[in-house]
Amino acid sequence: MFKHLRPVWAEINLDNLASNMKHIKELSNTKEIIGIVKADAYGHGALDIVPTLIENGATALAVAVVSEGVELRRGGIECPIMVLGFTPPSLIDMLLKHDIEQTVFSLDYAKELSKAAEKMHKVAKIHIAVDTGMGRIGFLPNEQSIQDVKAISMLPNIKIKGMFSHFSTADEKNKEYSAYQLNQFNKFYEGLKRENVNIETRHISNSAAIMDLPETIFEGVRPGIILYGYYPSNEVDKTKLELKPVMQLKTNVVHIKKIPSGEYISYGRKFKTDRESLIATLPVGYADGYTRLLFGKAKVIINGQLAPVVGRICMDQCMVDITDIKGDIKVGEEVILIGEKNGVKIDADDIAEMLGTINYEVICMISKRVPRVYIKNGEVIKVRNYI
């Protein structure tokens, strides 16, 4: 498709992204929409999709590590950016230099932030993480933690911007544990209010909670997977939110040949032809994020029809049986590995089911060896070739 690229690419539909963002904004109906763009925006290319998010309702961004935030700042992104995870003390200067907000879950760490901020004549903006039942980072919701956060609020050069927690089961039909977590969160907030600790923005709503738990929408929400067109599970109420997948993974046929019956395909002799077969080679493999765990399960879309991947997926190539595909398939034919054409689809949900994992992992797996091609109004507006 693209003369200057290898014949494997991920198409990123910015119109679908904009549509998802608009629907999320409408459903959330709150002040702060913190778009989750960690892991390079779940594999979609953070620098290239953030402008679309901001244009359509995102007011802030969240990343997992400080380097992701720095990349956005260097790319000209000026809106608030917070780090959801831990930033080592050795990288605090980087946080402050680029005006990136930091998650805090201990008094000692806050003191280090305060010292560094004083030294640099900066104000460290922070979000207090509360562990309401995830067992991950965060203050436990008890009296000692309330006193610690009060002490943090009094440190020089520290500004508490928000307080947040994370649901562990909001994407499940049974919301009992989510109700427990919400209660813990609310009690902790009331404890801070009692101590006159000012919290500007409470945010606990993840993708599933935005859809199913309107009572968790406070001053802010944190949409993640739903930005990219996928539901967090099959147990959420999908009627609440219309989503369109943003990414398609495509390639081209690079070789076709007839293989006699009784011949082996790929490593390990795990697949043997039981008839004369027409085999197409695709220049995509597990180094691109098309995992070899799909052996014996994967299908691709070619000429609007499904064709099975045969033999083990190699690091850089895989083979497809196109014997039963109608039409004259030639070298250069477009193949869809993740996506849809003429009502035939293989999406990240389908692949996740084959692998026994979640759609998040499938789209995050697409490696930076795969160029990202950005589509708007049906036209290519940008290509990001990482290598």
From Swiss-Prot:
The active site is at 38 (proton acceptor), 267 (proton acceptor). GO terms for cellular component: cytosol. One of its GO terms (biological process) is D-alanine biosynthetic process. The keyword Zinc does not apply. GO terms for molecular function: alanine racemase activity; pyridoxal phosphate binding. InterPro entries: Ala_racemase (IPR000821), Ala_racemase/Decarboxylase_C (IPR009006), Ala_racemase_C (IPR011079), Ala_racemase_N (IPR001608), Ala_racemase_pyridoxalP-BS (IPR020622), PLP-binding_barrel (IPR029066). The keyword Isomerase applies. Substrate binds at residues 136, 315. It catalyses: L-alanine = D-alanine. Its EC number is 5.1.1.1. Pfam families: Ala_racemase_C, Ala_racemase_N. Its cofactor is pyridoxal 5'-phosphate. It comes from the Bacteria. It is an enzyme of class 5 (isomerase). Pathway: Amino-acid biosynthesis; D-alanine biosynthesis; D-alanine from L-alanine: step 1/1. The modification N6-(pyridoxal phosphate)lysine is found at residue 38. CDD domains: PLPDE_III_AR. Keywords: Isomerase, Pyridoxal phosphate. Belongs to the alanine racemase family. NCBIfam families: alr (TIGR00492). Catalyzes the interconversion of L-alanine and D-alanine. May also act on other amino acids. This is Alanine racemase. It comes from Clostridium novyi (strain NT). The lineage of its organism: Bacteria, Bacillati, Bacillota, Clostridia, Eubacteriales. The gene is alr.
